[in-house]
Amino acid sequence: MEKKFLTWIHAGSLNFFGLAKYLQNEIGGEFFAIYDITEKPKKFLREQKLVKFNKIWFYDEHIKKNHFSLDKEYLAEFERKYNIHLWKLAANERIFIFNEFYQFSTNEILSIIEQECKFYEKVLDEIKPDYVLMLRPHFHYDTIFYQLCVARGIEVLELGTTRFPNRSSISSKNPSYNFSEVDSNKKSKLEIEYERFEITETTRSFEELQKYRKNNLSFSTGTDYENSPKHFISTGLEYFSTNNEIINKNWKYFGRSKFKVFFNYINEVFKQKRRQKFIEKKFLKKIDKNDKFVLFLLAVDSESSTLLDAAFYINQIEVVKNIVRSLPIEYTLLVKEHPASGLRSWRRIDEYEELINSPNVIPIHHSSNTEELIKKSSLVISISGSTLLDALFLEKPSLVFTNTDYSMIPDIKKIDKIENLSKTIKDALRIKVNPKNIEKYIQFVEYNSFEYNLTLHGLEMQKYVFGGSLLVDIEFSEEKMNEFFNKTKDEFDKLTRAYVKKISS
């Protein structure tokens, strides 16, 4: 009997559109797709002949704007039946809580969630897929879909990049999605597999491990496309000259009139400059003292690394205060801003002032050398960032606030309860990093991953399919899609082989 594959495809994961094409040629089966896409690509996706889908759905077409006949009993039963904490996801949805164009009411949020849950159940009941193929979720709605599939026993083959960018992995259950075993501190499938894994080679020295990390830290190949100021301006002109009907059809674009978008952009430019000026004046770029330091690395606000993975730690200024309260008296806390926060116009000045006015805190400029800061510190703390892994390579213990794909390493302590933070910090400060633990993690990742740069393949997709446009609501063409397939065939071959191996295992 043929296997059934359901793919979740959005504008940033068109590699799954290509994957479906190549998998059909390799192993056959029935293929279905849910598209989370804007209006203009729909015509191509409905009419295309490149990939044979037995049936497709467009997510946004099943979420109506004026649906207010709420069925809270259904939502309550859905939550109980599948053990999915809906408000935990909805209350941290960035489109709901960080939206500068539209204020969603409680009833609107519940209405959207109800329609999503009913739509997902209907699709799964209709086709009964054996596998779901998707990227790691980044919003409440694809996380609900992911968790629903897992709860119903459907194998979700989720593609994600590892902490070594040129390698990717296909996992059937991510450790950081706050399932019941995570919430109750039970061991995840990943942790159990890691414990059972045995090292097959001699442990490298710290010097050799650091060399490995540097060689596997940045992308091994580049892309010949990048956005120029001229291209940015042309994109803006293209946006203002096109139809904007999507704001009435897709809830994620509610309130985004061209007038509002234009003035929001102007406001963001001035806001970013004011905040940047404040940072330049108040944040240190270099630490000359030789005191005892603990380093906390801020995450970018409104990103899934905090909103989904660490739902109860999104107020990072409060996290800083809790760390300060828990430090041994001889330590000072260094707090480094994330360089990518500038893409979101930095944080509010009053947040920075609150940080600066906190006792025993030194604010560190985003351009400061992170490696040097780690070397000066006795412990490195973050919500979930990859820099904690870097710290281990530099022989510094780490402390993380949520489950990650590296938090099972013994030299990384995880916060189980905030009231235990003081003890956890003291325990972490006593850790002497063991190179054998790093070696095991490297070998474990290499064993469970394959050579494929997900980020670079995405950049190639943006270049060929979108023609380099910064807009997502543009028309697709068979010519552009074929160019993407042909120009990146080697990458699709790697991806297809990995999925065939996973499905066959």
Predicted features and spans:
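Catalytic donor nucleotide-activated moiety binding site of glycosyltransferases and closely related
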Residues: 321-364
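Histidine-anchored nucleotide/phosphate-binding helix
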Residues: 9-27, 146, 312-327
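Nucleotide-activated donor-dependent transferases that construct or modify glycoconjugates
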Residues: 1-13, 35-37, 105, 133, ...
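Conserved nucleotide-sugar donor-interacting segment of glycosyltransferase catalytic cores
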Residues: 118-181
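Conserved N-terminal ligand/cofactor-binding loop architecture of enzyme catalytic domains
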Residues: 22-120, 161-273, 493-494, 498-504
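A donor-sugar binding/catalytic signature common to diverse glycosyltransferases
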Residues: 135, 160, 366-413
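C-terminal amphipathic helix plus adjacent low-complexity
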Residues: 191-249, 279-283, 418-505
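Active-site donor-nucleotide binding/catalytic segment of nucleotide-sugar enzymes
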Residues: 288-317, 322-324, 337-341
